[in-house]
Structures are given as C-alpha cells and as structure tokens.
C-alpha cells in the first residue's frame, strides 16, 4: 500500500496571532490521512499499522513534512521579505495541549484483517471506518470474506483455523475450546469494549504455552507480538506502568510470559474490566486516557 503526499501547505506566522496559526495547523492535521486522536493523545500511524504518540519534537517533524511556515521580516535594505520558518514550538505545544478538543479523526485501533462490527456487519473495506473508529490497514492481498457463509463454509473455515493446533497436546476438549475462544476473541477484539484475558498453564516448562499465546497475538496484530516477562515488584506500580505503555503504543495483544506463583494485580483487573485506562505519562506532569 502507499499514501499520496500533498504539496506542503503554507502557513503564515504573525506575531500575536498564535491562536490563528494553531487553527491553521489543525486544519492541515485534520486532512492528513495518518494523523488521529487516540484517546486524548495525538498519534501518527506508521508502516504496518504501528501507532506512534506525538510529543513536541515529533509533531514539529510531522508538521514540517506537511506544511511550510513562513513570515515577513525587515531586510537590511528596509524592505519586507519573506522568510521560511521551521514549525514554531509554541504552536505545536498548543496543538498537543488541546487533547480531544483537536477534533481529529478518533482512532480506537488499527487492524490488518477484516473484523466484525458490533452490529454483526463485516468490516472488510480498507481505510478508516468512522462508525467503529478503526483503521483497516491491509496489504496488497486483502482477505475475501463471504458476506453470507453457508454452514459448510463455516466448518471449512474452522478446520482451516484449527489445523496448526490439531496435534497440540491439549488435555481435554475444554482446553481446546478455551484456545479457540482466545483466537475468535482476538479477531473481533477491536470492536469489543472489554474482553477477558486468556491464561495457559502446564506442569512443565517448554510445553508451548508462550507459542500458543503468540499465535493468538498474530491473529490480532498481524505479526509476532511482543512477549513481556513477568514482573514481581514490591507493589502494583510496575504492572500499571507496563500496561499503560503497551496501551499507549497501540499494541493489540500483550503476551505476559512466565508467571510463577500467584499474580494479583488491581491494575490488570482494571484494564480488563474497563473500556479505558488512565495513568500519568512517564517523565511529565500529565495524565492520559487510552
């Protein structure tokens, strides 16, 4: 896939007109195909559907790609001449401080394969879908999804989905059903307000628990997901920070690996039972909700 790049728009910088300049930059961001409001954060969607939160320096770079700021100055000869300018830091800070008042396209998640809307309709058209606030970023070979599948087609699809796991040593039919539920949940998770976590347990190490989790992650991420080793800090702070980092980065799957003993986390319980998660941004006196 590729995205068209427009001729940079010119924005004049006039002393005492900061609000007007901010509004002009907002107008450019509103028309940009890869800029979104992700909760209260301004983000840019990069290659492969990756979500990158913007800070002041990142926004100055993106603004410089899309716009050419300029102003008038007095030359030595006493004439007004045009001067090209970099994106003003104060204007970028204004944009970031507006939060959800920016009014950009609202983004909940980036998907790389078709999914189901909450009304049961199939979302299979590439691009941004305003009703679900999802961005479908597919490759050059989109999946053809039958809109009215027969029972035979559904059974064939189930057989195809389960084939890689047909020889895996699950203990019982219940264990196989849990893994199937995890895969189906992964496919529709972007349109669900909340969903359960799925745990894999075994009496010995090296039995394939992490592999199963990674397979589920590939269904929702479109690539091998990141694996995070278990942390056992003195309190819940490290878990909370890690969860917020993952959610803020737009990851759709988190493989929490090698849990030994009891895992009791209020932060994890909150993330699983609420459609949003709030925390303080590390290194800043600001909080954000994703």
Residue ranges with predicted function:
Residues 223-247:
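Short glycine-rich substrate-engagement loop in P-loop NTPases that contacts/grips substrate
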Residues 198-228:
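Walker A/P-loop
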Residues 177-189, 214-218, 270:
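Contiguous, well-ordered alpha-helical segments that form the cores/surfaces of helical PPI scaffolds
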Residues 265-288:
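Conserved catalytic/switch belt of AAA+ P-loop NTPases
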Residues 245-249, 261, 287-290:
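Conserved catalytic network of the ASCE P-loop NTPase/AAA+ motor domain
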Residues 193-198, 251-252:
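Pre-Walker A (Motif I) flank of P-loop NTPase domains
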